[in-house]
Amino acid sequence: MYALFLLFGLGCDEGKIYPDETVDSGRTATVSLSFTGLKAWPKENMLSLCAFGEDKSKPLQTQRISKPAEDGKRLKLRLNNVTPDTRSIEVAVISRGLRLVYSYYTSPVDDSDEPLDLSVGELDLASFKRIQAQVFDLNCLSCHGGGSGLAGQLDIRDDVAYKSLVNVKAPLSEEGKNYVTPGNINNSFLLDILENNPVHKDMFNSSGKQEVLALIQGWILGGALDN
């Protein structure tokens, strides 16, 4: 009996032969940064820390960023388990369908296994480049620079949009407003067009319109820089 006990006892004592599947795999990306222009914080879309592969239109991983309490507050963000097919780490505006809207910052990723530690500095959310990408390029060029001509004599293609808007009189403004007057949202006809013009006011859903107007207002109040 004692021999049988030893036989079965040894047969059942396999020890711990399975790997611990709770251990993280992949690299970690740590990013330190701060934001200004918080008025332009996305409402419809999401500001996120992202990992992108070869396809730049859709991220492999995202970590949504929480809005800080004030401009300039230093944040430290982390993206865990960065996969080997990652080609860049980016701070970007992402749609709810997880499509890239606009990237504020990008850093290439090499093939090593070392952790990524990135110091980004300060990002201005109310940037003209984001307005160009998110608003003009996606919604306006068919009438203001595309094949059908220039509605309202306004050309907002990427290479001429800034010069077409800032401190330029809007021919359709009855009050004689500029399209954009730096620092003055009440004398910027671009906002009137998006808020009140029958052709344009329904271009976005409610939260999307709030996001676009806040973005443009924040940019104008910040001096309407070519940034």
For each feature predicted by the language model, list its residue ranges.
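Sec-dependent bacterial lipoprotein signal peptides
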Residues: 1-11
